[in-house]
Amino acid sequence: MARLSEIAEEANEVKSRFLANMSYNIRIPLNNVVGFSQLLSTDMGLDDKEKLEYSEIIQANSTDLIQLVNDVLDLSRLEAKMMKFQIQDCEIREICNDLIYMARRDSNGHIHAELESDVEHQMLRMDANRFNQAVLSMLIYPVPNDTDREVKMQLSKDEENQLLIFRIINSPLVDPAFASQQVSIRLKINQLLFEHFGGSFMVSESAEDGYPITFSIATL
């Protein structure tokens, strides 16, 4: 709980600093997009290799810029309880298997994700897209990385409290090596999302156990 409180406080501080300096944070990728776009359109002496390199820079910075803005908007909507959800019936074991596949695919095979589940079949009513986005963020690297990594997702059911309990071990998202403003905001988004659906979200301080993330969602 102490770690979760720290995450919440850090995320609030980060968001405040981010909003106060949004023009600076946006300016860097925006300037790269504009600058390299101008080079592509005006410098007739560029060879094919340089054109490809500049195009990749433009694409990467455009993606970063969009993600940066979307995360802050999502966080603001969740905190104001104005987030719109698309609720549907979902089978959780099927969704988890899909997430394991997506983690391997999106990391080009560098994330060796594995699912351990005591739950054979469980239907939930939730926003599957939001759920997938949150869980996938905990399975893959928050920034491009080609290091092989074992990540395990465990799924169990708390019958008494009518909760599904998830535990992700060795998540790159809480690895101190990848700490950043965007990671702190993503963690806060995940916390608010699971709390909205009647669950909880907690990050352990134990480095020895791979900083496990435990979160839950109500089965009602």
Question: What do the predicted segments below correspond to?
Answer:
Residues 2-42:
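Primarily the dimerization/phosphotransfer
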Residues 60-65:
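Short alpha-helical segment of the dimerization/phosphotransfer core of two-component systems
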Residues 72, 76-87:
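Helix-loop junction within the histidine kinase core
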Residues 86-101, 132:
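A conserved beta-strand-to-alpha-helix junction within the catalytic ATP-binding
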